Amino acid sequence: MFLGRAASRTCRHSQPLRVAARAKSTTTAVASSSWHQYGVTGGILASTSSSSRTVVNPAKQRRWVRMASTATATKPTEEASSSDQPPAPAHKLTDNDVKRLTFQRNIGISAHIDSGKTTLSERILFYTGKIREIHEVRGRDAVGAKMDNMDLEREKGITIQSAATFCDWEATNPEDGSKQKYSINVIDTPGHVDFTIEVERALRVLDGAILVLCAVAGVQSQTTTVDRQMRRYNVPRISFINKMDRPGANPWRIVNQIRTKLRMPAAAVQVPIGTEDELKGVVDLVHWRALYNEGPKGTEIRVSKDIPESVAELAKQKRAELIEQLAEVDEEIGELFLMDETPTNRQIADAIRRATIDLKFSPVFMGSAMKNTGVQFLLDGVCEYLPNPSEREVLAIDNKNLDPATASSQASQTPNVPLVPAAAAPFVGLAFKLEEGRFGQLTYVRVYQGTLKKAMNIWNVRTGKKVKVPRLVRMHSDEMEDIDSIGPGEICAMFGVECSSGDTFTDGTSTYSMTSMFVPEPVISLAIKPKGQETPNFSRALNRFQKEDPTFRVHIDQESKETIISGMGELHLEIYVERMRREYNTECITGKPRVAFRETITQRAEFAYTHKKQTGGAGQFARVIGYIEPMEMDPETGKDVAFENLVMGGNIPTNFIPAVEKGFYEALEKGSLTGNPITGVRFVLKDGAFHAVDSSELAFRLATIGAFREAFKKARGIVLEPVMTVDVVAPSEFQSNVIGGLNTRRGTIVDSEVRDDEFTAVAEVALNDMFGYSNQLRGSTQGKGEFSMEYKHHAPVLPNVQKELEEAYQKTLPQSKK
């Protein structure tokens, strides 16, 4: 979409500086701020009057420039042809829409475990007046944090399920001190990698996020995972360095890690006043003022134009650094920088907002949620720098002209349709989370277009069924507030509507559907059975849990007839086993954890397979010709298997193509090497033949299964195992013990860092080699070490391991199948 060049000049400090100009979209392009044409601006106290908007020289508007190489925006770098552009929006925002959306925010809070997300959420609710008392995580006062509403969450001190709430915040205009009320929807997400699906579905429907980092630990394994998820859904983020009161806090090291480890241009917009226990407030580098939290629980804000001498010089350096970073990603600041002119406070703030919304920059805030410092200023930053719902580009797929039989293959070729958050437009919403509530299924919905009303009839696009909305509520953690209607850009919940996570709902006047969220594959499994006689509660619980959580899978092993549950880690499965005991009064016995091995191919293989069966009367005939080849995972969709139909001339009637596709996916369910699912394969159908009488869908499905198995033998199949990124933190004196322990488990050290009396080691280790590691680490560090791990990828097992797995699988097969 963007053409031209990024200027590269030498600044007054004799350092190369890449200056990026803001991209100007054509009249047909839909940019991230596509609704600005309707008067929607988004900063604090934004106005639709011309005086409040940045005036851009028309000559500059005619320039086309490419964003600087340091920018991480995921937008196209070349101009798209007009035929590739989404059609213009069919509806426009009214003045009421503009007024409502301008002061609305939908944000998530995400981070590595124990970075202080839930503590921050608790302070946000307290300062916005949503709760009257502050309660801490782990339920030390027998109450626990508001957003951790499960007993298990309060006992373990971790967030297991994402929790949604809403609040109002009166943001302060830094220029005149006036107040403006903003409505904010907040979703607090888990930090543990085992519950990563909660982060996925939250980010899928949010307009912005707060990335929380520990001032001591910095960027950790789950931080990089959250960063990747934010990029997947193009979610702008502001960063908050929490725990600034801790000994060893070093915010400047963390800012540098955001730039280097997360590859996100970032700069501090604040400098802490005081360190560790002496933390009193922050210096606002943008508006050049000192901000202090005083009074009980930091509720009283004192603003001073006098910067403390102890941090004045550092603040000047960091403000200059902020301007330099902005000059690399924003045209206006870049031009001022090259002309050696100092931008005004307003110009800096506007540039931060533009660059943040365009995914090119992350402003970094600082504070301590536990010590009630910096949270109110962070809320002001949410209002000033993160987008409102109209400033996010939201596209839907128009299914009007799609053939249901081949809709999946046509969808990627269908032009996307922009959705407009106009209240009068046809309703479009996405169900992103399900819960079993006291009054039936609770379905969380993000309304993207139109208005959702109680007792309204809506259509599930996936099933084509019409349903009535019997009850509509807004959620405050586990509390509900009944409402009659809710407008676009809002998040709500419906009772009594049966659906699946990721379903699109409309009012029946449109044929739009939205892409669902990315669902990672499980990496660990174990056998489970009820203790004693099986009860209906056992199957009822399993059915409910796998409906609520797409990463929790249940199946029956055909050989052993055991019930197998699969998930993202040991803790993930342990939590569900414990919930079965507590919520369904069902004690369970579990087997040893099993690693989720996979099979794949390493080379292309042709097939020309004929399925014939004659039983007297109508027989079966189908012939399929084509090839299979290795396929890399698509980083955006997560898909690593694909079916392609290249048949021309009607050699296979189109009504049999879906049967071929079904046969391919059925063949992937169980590989011939170890009986595990097959991944990383593209199936290409080139030709075939049929019989006017004997051909059927069954015949083509069986022919495809036979063809795939025949080709798999020639494609040099291998076995894959999950490899984990393991993050170990321990006192420096135990460094050799930790490294030695990882080496004995065939781990590869990819990074290490020593700071003060503590060190961190990051290694890649096969999950199969990680069982029992917690006991080993505890023994080798005298109980002072801790580790976390997250799934990285599947990699080939060693040849001797593959041989053992194949031999073990062969022993389970009946003699007739060997």
UniProtKB/Swiss-Prot annotation:
Residues 67-96 are annotated as: Disordered. Residues 1-23 form a transit peptide. The keyword Nucleotide-binding applies. Pathway: Protein biosynthesis; polypeptide chain elongation. CDD domains: EF-G, EFG_III, EFG_mtEFG1_IV, mtEFG1_II_like. Mitochondrial GTPase that catalyzes the GTP-dependent ribosomal translocation step during translation elongation. During this step, the ribosome changes from the pre-translocational (PRE) to the post-translocational (POST) state as the newly formed A-site-bound peptidyl-tRNA and P-site-bound deacylated tRNA move to the P and E sites, respectively. Catalyzes the coordinated movement of the two tRNA molecules, the mRNA and conformational changes in the ribosome. Belongs to the TRAFAC class translation factor GTPase superfamily. Classic translation factor GTPase family. EF-G/EF-2 subfamily. This is Elongation factor G, mitochondrial. The gene is MEF1.
